[in-house]
């Protein structure tokens, strides 16, 4: 693939055009030794606790653009935190680009070790994946990243010993299994001991009973549900948080009976009193007497949550009739290959069949199915006034995804900056999602690596894309949040459970002299971005919900305007037989990975009640502070272009796209506000943060449609014409006589 696109540099004897050697000749390196030395001495700024492991000099970082090859000469280094290239940023490749949206932790030439997806070596123009010990070392290194960057390094002019050292070091530190305590996370925490900022003033962390009580009061759920501390110190279960919420009649002994399994745990309460609950499956038993004990236990739990004042319960078994983790993993592996492009030629070679490849990956359909299931759950909560109980083996994957999606759609608070971050803390971090395994940070099991959280962010992006004014944060916020999964200075996404975090951070240490380590959370955005860059994370078009006085609040306490006109279906109870079916062998078999064949084709349509609910909602004007439903028809589910296409220059629209529209809207809003201030003659009446255009957006004609990540990327000089269509246009001479044709890529 690399050779076909002309990426093969030195050693390319078959290439008809000049190879990379013709641009950087060995004699130039020797005659300009002083200049090269000066370029190589770019300072490597190490983070606290970061250690240099290996390095190589006279490495060329290059990009491939059809017939031209441009590169930077510098050093390639590997630390216990990242791979970094130190070169002359003023070279022709960057062309004087200003980096306004700069990450303070990760530079443009830095790759966190956890962000490396695959490493390839180029041998005689053939690209091969690199694993373990090598007998022969490549002349080029190609690194595919989990944030979908593709970086090329030429090692042709590097000393042989340095090549062996840097290649072996990178392979070892990015692919070898690791122990948790050997992660850079702990080195950094020890080096900055006690200096971590506390973001609790804005984001609810849900690590104290007070936080849970506050959430119960906010959602009016405190009448039927209570906060319990039976697991304080993780005495009952290391899978659950120290504090959580259960139905009020539930006894502590019930929680202890099966180590927190088989217990309905509260997620969120609807304005009409119904609630979203989740439950993990009981242990698999073969003995009939043990199964009978489990059934009796569940019968008692079911009766507890099925009698007044609790609503009727509908169970949703996510393991038998929804997505499997294997399906998500397989689909994303196919999907991401569409964006890991090695060259411009490769991009155009796949252009004609791109949509077919996109469809065959199934990723967009998985997103649609998640949104559809969330709508069906919402219909039960909102229209049928039923409690919904989500069932899953550990209640820590698809339960997290669907419960979070439902809350984003139903609760306007979860669409605010702090509300969304608090939601992730509650449902994902405290909910026990296995970030360490699902992101494969320790490289111990590739089978466990499943992008469930990324799938959630992609679903939220669909909502942000369809209803921009409803969210206080932007798609850029979601993009950098997805990137933060692989930055090991934040504890948020590097543990499988609160118990694992507290244990390894020393909070359960019996040594009185041993102080627990303190880590940053990802929610302290000042660690990564300056205030100017942070303005791009907040939506200037978002308007806060107006506060009502007491008289107004009484009249609209439970129903917001949109739902008053929706048909309410009579509540129907779930038959008991359906409840017990989930915790037996049938549930366990599905939880262990049984693939559901042809589920995509059989689940295209919403159920009748949900379809009526969905159509009624979309027939009325949108209340951005009320219930929010996405369009889920095929064409409405789109590719998250900013995240997936941001490193591909050919996929950009220079001076166009949504960023241009946003720039014009902000200019109009600023003008209107200026006129209002002049009329009222109150120049300092209030700060205009929410309507002030970030300076970078003022000249949108200079920006890319994939701003702010691709603002100054060099665009290919080649005519925008797929290479697969060249043969149909005749020979090369005939093609040269034709005028260039412009093909509009449109909205991806």
Curated annotation (Swiss-Prot):
Q: Which residues form the Myotubularin phosphatase domain?
A: 206-644
Q: Which region ranges are annotated with the description Disordered? A: 549-576
Keyword Repeat included in the entry's annotation: no
Location relative to the cell? Cytoplasm; Sarcoplasmic reticulum; Cytoplasm, Myofibril, Sarcomere
Please provide the record's keywords in A-Z order: Cytoplasm, Phosphoprotein, Sarcoplasmic reticulum
Superkingdom of source: Eukaryota
Q: Which GO terms describe its cellular component?
A: cytoplasm; membrane; sarcomere; sarcoplasmic reticulum
Pfam families the record matches: 3-PAP, Myotub-related
For this UniProt entry, the molecular function terms from Gene Ontology, in alphabetical order, are: phosphatidylinositol-3-phosphate phosphatase activity
Q: Output compositional bias ranges, type Polar residues.
A: 563-573
Basic residues: which segments have biased composition? 553-562
Biological process annotations from GO: phosphatidylinositol dephosphorylation
InterPro entries, alphabetized: MTMR12-like_C, MTMR12_PTP, Myotubularin, Myotubularin-like_Pase_dom, PH-like_dom_sf, Prot-tyrosine_phosphatase-like
Q: Which residues are modified to Phosphoserine? A: 565, 602
Q: What is its main location?
A: cytoplasm
**What family does the database annotate?**
Belongs to the protein-tyrosine phosphatase family. Non-receptor class myotubularin subfamily.
Instruction: Explain the purpose of this protein.
Output: Acts as an adapter for the myotubularin-related phosphatases. Regulates phosphatase MTM1 protein stability and possibly its intracellular location. By stabilizing MTM1 protein levels, required for skeletal muscle maintenance but not for myogenesis.
Assembly behavior: Heterodimer with lipid phosphatase MTM1. Heterodimer with lipid phosphatase MTMR2.
Which protein is depicted? Myotubularin-related protein 12
Q: Which organism is it from?
A: Rattus norvegicus (Rat)
This chain is encoded by the gene named Mtmr12
């Amino acid at each position: 693939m690399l050779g076909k696109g002309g990426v093969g540099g030195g050693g390319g004897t078959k290439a008809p055009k000049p190879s990379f050697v013709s641009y950087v000749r060995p004699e130039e390196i020797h005659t300009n030794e002083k200049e090269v030395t000066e370029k190589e001495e770019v300072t490597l700024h190490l983070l606290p606790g970061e250690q240099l492991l290996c390095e190589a000099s006279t490495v060329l970082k290059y990009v491939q653009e059809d017939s031209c090859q441009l590169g930077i000469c510098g050093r390639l280094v590997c630390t216990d935190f990242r791979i970094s290239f130190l070169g002359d940023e003023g070279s022709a490749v960057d062309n004087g680009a200003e980096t306004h949206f700069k990450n303070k932790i990760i530079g443009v030439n830095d790759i966190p070790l956890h962000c490396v997806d695959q490493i390839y070596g180029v041998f005689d123009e053939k690209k091969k994946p690199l694993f373990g010990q090598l007998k022969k070392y490549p002349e080029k290194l190609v690194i595919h990243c989990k944030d979908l960057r593709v970086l090329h390094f030429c090692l042709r002019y590097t000393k042989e010993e340095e090549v062996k050292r840097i290649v072996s070091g990178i392979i070892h530190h990015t692919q070898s299994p690791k122990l948790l305590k050997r992660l850079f996370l702990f080195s950094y925490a020890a080096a900055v001991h006690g200096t971590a900022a506390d973001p609790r003033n804005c984001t609810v962390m849900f690590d104290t009973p007070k936080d849970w009580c506050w959430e119960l009061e906010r959602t009016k759920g405190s009448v039927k549900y209570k906060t319990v501390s039976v697991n304080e110190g993780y005495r009952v279960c290391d899978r659950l948080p120290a504090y959580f919420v259960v139905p009020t009649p539930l006894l502590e002994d019930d929680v202890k009976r099966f180590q927190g399994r088989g217990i309905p745990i509260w997620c969120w309460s609807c304005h009409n009193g119904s609630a979203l609950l989740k439950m993990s499956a009981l242990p698999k038993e073969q003995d009939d007497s043990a199964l009978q004990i489990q059934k009796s236990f569940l019968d008692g739990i079911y009766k507890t949550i099925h009698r007044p004042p609790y609503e009727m319960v509908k169970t949703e078994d996510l393991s038998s009739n929804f997505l499997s983790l294997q399906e998500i993993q397989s689909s994303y592996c196919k999907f991401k290959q569409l964006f890991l492009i090695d060259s411009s030629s490769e991009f155009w070679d796949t252009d004609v069949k791109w949509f077919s490849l996109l469809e065959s990956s199934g990723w967009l359909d998985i997103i649609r199915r998640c949104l559809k299931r969330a709508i069906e759950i919402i219909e039960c909560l909102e229209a049928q006034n039923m409690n919904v109980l989500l069932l899953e083996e550990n209640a820590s994957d698809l339960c997290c995804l669907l419960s979070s999606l439902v809350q984003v759609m139903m609760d306007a608070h979860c669409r605010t900056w702090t509300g969304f971050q608090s939601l992730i803390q509650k449902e994902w971090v405290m909910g026990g999602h296995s970030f360490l395994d699902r992101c494969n940070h320790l490289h111990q099991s590739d089978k466990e690596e499943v992008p469930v959280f990324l799938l959630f962010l992609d679903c939220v992006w669909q909502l942000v894309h369809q209803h921009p004014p409803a969210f206080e944060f932007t798609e850029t916020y979601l993009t950098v949040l997805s990137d933060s999964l692989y930055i090991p200075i934040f504890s948020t996404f590097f543990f499988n459970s609160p118990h694992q975090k507290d244990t390894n951070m020393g909070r359960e240490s019996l040594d009185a002299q041993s102080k627990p380590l303190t880590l940053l959370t990802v929610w302290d955005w000042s660690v990564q971005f300056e205030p100017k860059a942070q303005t791009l994370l907040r939506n200037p078009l978002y308007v806060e919900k107006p506060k009502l006085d007491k008289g107004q609040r009484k009249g609209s306490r439970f129903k917001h305007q949109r739902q008053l006109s929706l048909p309410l279906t009579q509540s129907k109870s779930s038959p008991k037989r359906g409840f017990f079916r989930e915790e037996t062998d049938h549930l366990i078999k599905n939880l262990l990975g049984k693939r559901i064949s042809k589920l995509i084709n059989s689940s295209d349509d919403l159920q009748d009640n949900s379809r009526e609910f969905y159509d009624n909602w979309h027939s009325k004007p949108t209340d951005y502070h009320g219930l929010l439903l996405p369009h889920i028809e095929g064409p409405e589910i789109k590719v998250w272009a900013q995240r997936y296409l941001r490193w591909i220059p050919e996929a950009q629209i220079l001076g166009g796209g949504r960023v241009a529209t946003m720039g014009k809207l902000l200019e109009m809003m600023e003008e209107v506000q200026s006129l209002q201030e002049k009329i009222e003659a109150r120049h300092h009446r209030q700060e205009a943060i929410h309507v002030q255009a970030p300076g970078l957006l003022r000249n949108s004609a200079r920006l890319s449609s994939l701003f702010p990540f691709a603002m100054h990327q060099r665009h290919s000089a080649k005519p925008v014409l797929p290479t697969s269509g060249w043969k149909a246009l005749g020979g090369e001479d005939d093609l040269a006589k034709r005028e260039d044709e412009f093909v509009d890529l449109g909205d991806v």
